[in-house]
Amino acid sequence: MYKRQFLHYALRLALFAVFSEVPYDLLFQGRVLEFSRQNILFTLLTALLVMRLLDLAAKKRNVFLFIGALLLAVVPYFLHFSYGVYGVLSVLCFFLFQKYRGIDAIAFSALTYGRYLYDGNFTQLYAIAASIPILLYNGKRGAVSLKYFFYIIYPAHLLVLYAIHYILANHLLPF
């Protein structure tokens, strides 16, 4: 990814991460702004930055960039981003093994199973099924017309879920 493309992508992720935080906090914390948990877009932004640092570290053979990538990868743990370090490592499984189709899915499955062994969250094991469409990806860029749809759908679905929760919790239905 070229420097300009990377910067635009990182800025878009950052903008929508901030924009999505209010709907996320409303749904999960019941407040407009609550800093005890952050949405997944912050995790994805961190993963993007880690990938960039790893790329630069490999190209420049710079151990300090590599160490910086490792340190950045644990930031989601301390800032309470959704999925934490596991979220960053999940993205890295597919990034680091992108030339080895199938190995990426095995790495992701092993990581996910390891998380299950660590915290006992059985439902996270269903994430392994996400490997299937990723393995079927043909490597071609999707429709540009849908570019912002996927950014907008995330905060929009959070607002819809919050509205449903609010209506049900406050008994606002006439029946």
Regions found by a protein language model. Give the residues of each.
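Alpha-helical transmembrane segments and their immediate juxtamembrane cytosolic regions
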Residues: K3-F175
